[in-house]
Amino acid sequence: MINLFITASKYIQLLLIVLYTYCNFRYLSIPDQEDADPLCDWQLRIILLVHFLMNCIIYLKTADMSAVWFYLLQLAFFLLYTFGAQRLYRNINRLLLNNTVFFLTYGLIMLERLDAAKAMKQFVIIVGAAALTLVIPYLIDKIWDLVRWRFAFAAFGILLQGVVLIIGATSYGAKMSISIGGFTFQASEIVKITFVLAMAGMLSRATEFRDIVLSSLVAAAHVLVLVACKDLGSALIFCLAYLVMLFIATNRSLYLVLGTAAMGGASVFSYAAFSHVRKRVFAWINPWADIDDRGYQITQSLFAIGTGGFAGLGLYQGMPNRIPIVEKDFIISAISEEMGAITAICIILVCLGCFMQMMVIATYMEDSFYKLVAVGLAIEYIVQSFLTIGGAIKFIPSTGVTLPFISYGGSSLVSAFIVFAIIQALYIIQGNEDEADELEELEEYEETPDDEDEALEEDNAENDAYASEQVSAEDLDL
C-alpha cells in the first residue's frame, strides 16, 4: 500500500508541476494583476499540495517523526511569508512571490532527502533571509536613494573582492569565500548586487563618452579581481550583466560586439592561464576518457539524469549522493533522477518565467536607474541559472555556481532573496505611482462635472438677468 501511494504521488507531482508551469506563463499574458489573482491562488495551492505529498514520502521512507515536525515548520513559514508579504505590500508581484516559495519547496525537499541536517540549516537561513529582506521594498521606496550611493557600492564591491583575493579560502581551484567570526560566506554573491547598483547609477547618469569609459573601468576592476581569484563563473556573470546594461543605457550595438570579442579573448587567456579551467574543459569535452577522476562528476550527473528518465525513480529510489557536491552545483541532476526530467524541465521553465517577469517589470520602469537595476539583476539571475543547469547537463563546462533558492548554500540563498526583494521593490514603486496617477485622473474627472454645472448655472443666471432686462424695457415702453 505504501509503495502504491509513493508511485501515485510521483505521477501526481508531475501533473501538478506541469499545471503550475502553465499557470506561470498564463500569468504573463494577463495585463492586470487583479485579473491574475485567482491564477496565483491556484499556484499557491499547487505548491502546498506538492509540498505535502513529497513530505509524506519522506516520512514513509524514513519513519522519523522529526520529518513531520520539519514539514509543519516549513508549512507555517510558507503561509506566513506568503500572506505576510501580501499584507505588507498591496502591490507585490504575486508571481515572483509564488515562484520563490516554489523554488524553496523543491530545494528543501531534495536537501532533506540528501542530508536532513543540511536541510534544517538551510531552512534556518531561509527564515532569517526572508524576514530581513521583507523590509527592502519599504526601505527602497521610502528611505534609500540608491543612485546617490553608486560610487560607494563600486568601492565596496572592489574592496570586498580584494579581501577575498588576499585572505580568501581556496575551494576547487578558486578563491571565493572568507570566514568572519566562524561564519563563511561567498563574497561574490553579495558583490554581484552592489555591482548592478553601482553600474546602474553610473550609466543612468552618463551624459558623455567619458562617463561610459569610467563605468567600464569600474566594471573591469570588478571582473579583474574575480579573475585573479580564479572565480571565472562569477566573472562571466558580471561581464554579461554589464554588457546588457550598457546596451540598454546607450542603445549602441557596437558595445555588445566589442564586449563579446573581449570576453572571447578572456576565455582563451583563462584556458591558458588556469589549470582548473583546463581540467573542467577537458571533463566537458570528453568526460569518459577519465571517468574515474576529472570526468567523474559530470558522468555521474549524466548517469543520474539518464536513469531517472521523464518520470523519475521516486524519492529515495535513486543514488544522487554518488555525485560530488550534488547539493550545490548539481542539485538539478538529483532532482531529475528522482523526480523526473519533466520536473527538471518545469523548474527550468519557471526560472525562465521569472526572468521574463523581471524584464517586463524593467520595461514598466520610467526611471532609468530603476530600469537598469531590473535589467542587470534579471540578467545575473538567468545567466547564473543557465550556468548551473548547463554545467550539470554537459551543455557547457561546469562553472561552480549555484541554482538560486534551490542549491544548498547560505550566501547564494541570501543573495537570491535580496535580488527578488529589490525587483519586488521596483514593481511596488511603479504600482504605487500608477495608483497615484489613476487617483489624480479620477479626482480631475470628478471635478469636471462640477465645473460644468457651475458654468451652466452662470449661463442660466445670465439668461435670467437678460430676460429681466427685456421685461423691464417693455414695461418702460408701455
Predicted stretch roles:
Residues A36, D211, V326-A334, K371, ...:
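Membrane-interface alpha-helices at helix entry/exit sites of multi-pass transporters
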